Amino acid sequence: MKQTSKTKSADFYPYGRLRRAFKQARRFGLMALAAVLLPGSVPAGEATVIVMLGDSLTAGYGLAQQNSLPAKLQSHLRAQGLGVRIINAGVSGDTTSGGLARLDWALADPPSHVIVALGANDGLRAIDPALTADNLDRIIADLKSRGIIVLLAGMRAPPNLGRDYATEFDQIYPRLAEKHSVALYPFLLDGVAATADLNQSDGMHPNAAGVDVIVERLSPYVIELLKNN
C-alpha cells in the first residue's frame, strides 16, 4: 500500500521526516540529525509531544496529510485548549513486528506520550496472535522503561479468520493494558469499520469523514490521559 502525501501544516511533522533525518545522520554524523530535527522542535513547556505509532490507519493512506488521524486529532485537541504536537509515526503496511523494529527512530523527537495503534495488518495477514501480543508487550514495556505514558488503541480480528482466532486476537489489547496498567481505547475503528460512507473505496481505510468519527471517539481518552498525567 502506498501513502499519499499532499498538504502539510507548519507544525505537523510526519514520520517520513525522521526517517530522512536518520539517513542523513548516517552520512554526516549526529550533528546532521540535530540540524534536521531542531527546526521542528517546540520549546520545552510550550507543547506536549505525542507520537502516534501505527500503520496506514495512522499514516493517512489515501488522504491529504491534513486529514490524517494524527493531524485531525492534533487540531481537535488544540481547539480544546490543549497545547499538543502530534508526530505521525504511521507506516502503511506495518505490523507489530515492524513497529517494534523502528521504535527507536519513531522516538527520535522525544515524546511524553505515545499512542500505540498497531495490529490491524497482523490480523489481515493472520499472524499468530501470540507473536502480535509479544511484540506489543515489548513495545509497551520499552516505552514505559523510558518514562513514556502509553495509550493502547485496540484492534479486532477480521471476521473471516474464524471464532478461535478472533477470540485470541481480540483479547490481546485488554490483557496487555491490564498487565502494564496503561490506558486502553478498545477499538480504533469504533463507529467506522464496515460503514461504507465512512471508508474509502477499498472498504478498509477511513475517509476524511471516518477520521472525524475516530477523533470524536478517541479524543476523550487522550484528553483524560493528558489531564491525569
Model-derived regions, located:
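Serine-esterase "nucleophile elbow" of acetyl-processing enzymes
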Residues: P43-S92, R102-P110
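Alpha-helical cap/lid subdomain in secreted, periplasmic
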Residues: G45, K72, L82, G98-N229
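N-terminal helical cap/lid subdomain that shapes the substrate entry/recognition surface
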Residues: G93-S97
